[in-house]
């Protein structure tokens, strides 16, 4: 977990073993051929995990992502974009494969 002050986790959230929450990444818009990537500055963005989310084992949540209420992130997924509520998202990068009706 990086920059924990940028991470918001709702109620009844399951974050399973080996999950990484990354609030920073290298800003590759500054990259130049022949220079080390490590010379690129870090950019930071928050992660917001809403109520009732399940994040499967070994998943990676990238900076700037919001995971909607009741969503399920499949094991080993890399979440690079916002995930809507009440769905299942899997893969690298994570894509929605199923949606659920909110019964409330």
Where are these regions (language model features)?
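Flexible, glycine/small-residue-enriched loop-and-beta-strand segment within the central core
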Residues: 1-66, 92-93, 100-101
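C-terminal/domain-terminus segments
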Residues: 65-90
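C-terminal end-helix/capping segment
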Residues: 83, 87-104
């Amino acid at each position: 977990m990086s920059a924990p002050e940028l991470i918001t986790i709702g109620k009844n959230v399951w974050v399973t073993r080996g999950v990484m929450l990354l609030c920073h990444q290298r800003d590759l818009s500054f990259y130049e051929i022949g220079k080390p990537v490590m010379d690129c500055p870090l950019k930071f963005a928050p992660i917001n995990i809403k109520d009732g989310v399940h994040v499967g084992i070994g998943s990676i949540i990238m900076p700037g992502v919001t995971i909607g209420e009741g969503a399920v992130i499949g094991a080993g997924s890399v979440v690079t974009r916002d995930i809507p509520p009440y769905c299942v998202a899997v893969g690298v990068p994570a894509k929605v494969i199923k949606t659920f009706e909110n019964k409330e």
